[in-house]
Each structure stands twice: as structure tokens, then as C-alpha cells.
Amino acid sequence: MSAFAGGIQTIDIHAHFYPESYLRILSELDGESPVTCSWDHADGPIITFWGGDTPPLHKTYYDFHERVKEMDDKGVDIHCLSLTQPMVHWADPALALKLSETYNDACAEAHKAYPDRYLGFAMLPMLQPDAALEELKRRADLPGMRGVYPSTQIEGRELSDTLFFPHLRGRARDGLAHVPASGPRRRI
């Protein structure tokens, strides 16, 4: 834990996390998928999506035990874990739900292992309203989950699109949603 005077905690509310279980699912996808993951690089897995590659992911992106050591080194008390690009919205409905559940379960696992260090922002398959609402309800029972992390633009649709109204109503009843800016900055 950090040594800041006065007991003030340092909280990183925008801490991206690619659980190994999520990456393993991506690595099992065939070459026709717009998103894949390769574990062939010595420095870490590489995610390929929409024609580009991430740099090799450092172990702290996918191993929450290693991440705690880095948090200690940097004086950070709590990470609010969130998935970043490519998220799940590119996938067919069944895969989007599987990836969301896998990610959310991994966040809960990190919280159970380090309850004072990790909280999670859930991922939902936003383009499938019924599945997203069910996962939103399931997420409420997972330990350490404190909100939802959507993009402001999902497959060309802004959060103001009526497709997302059921999710937004569910979140309003449920509490916090952390909404990162993405896509054109016309309005947020």
C-alpha cells in the first residue's frame, strides 16, 4: 500500500486489464476472426485487431498477481480494472457474451485474491440488449464489481442510441458507469 501521509489512498480508476482467460479465448479464434491473440512473442501476447497489432502485452496487463507488485512499486493502492480495445462488441452474440462473462469473472477473481487492491468495471455485450441486461444482473452478484465500462461509441452507435436505453436504465438503478471518451468527440 502507498505511504502517503494522512491515509489518503491512490486509486487508478482507468486501469486496463486483459485477463489471461480472455486472451486465451482470442487465441483460439480462427484466422477469419477480426480479432486474434498470439502467444508466440517472447515479450508477451499480441492482440491483432482490425489489421493492427498491440505491442507485446507486459505480464501486468494479464496477471493480477504481477500487477500488485507493480502497484506497490508505484505507490498505487487500488486499481479499478477495465477492459479496453478491442473489447467484445466486434464478436457474434454468443462470443460477445462469453468474452464478457470471462472478463467479469476474472475481475471478481482478482478482487477475491486481493479485496483491498482490485475493483472491477464490468464488460457487457452492448449490442445484444437482452444478454447485456442478464450480464448486468449477474455482475451485481460478483464480488468487487463496482460499475460498467462501456465505450461512448459502439460499432458506430453513440450511447444516446435507443438500443442502449435498457442498459442505461439498468445502470442508473445499479450505480456507477465509467464512460471513457472514444470515437468522434461530437458530444459526450
Model-derived segments and their meaning:
Residues 1-188:
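Helix-coil boundary/capping segments in enzymes
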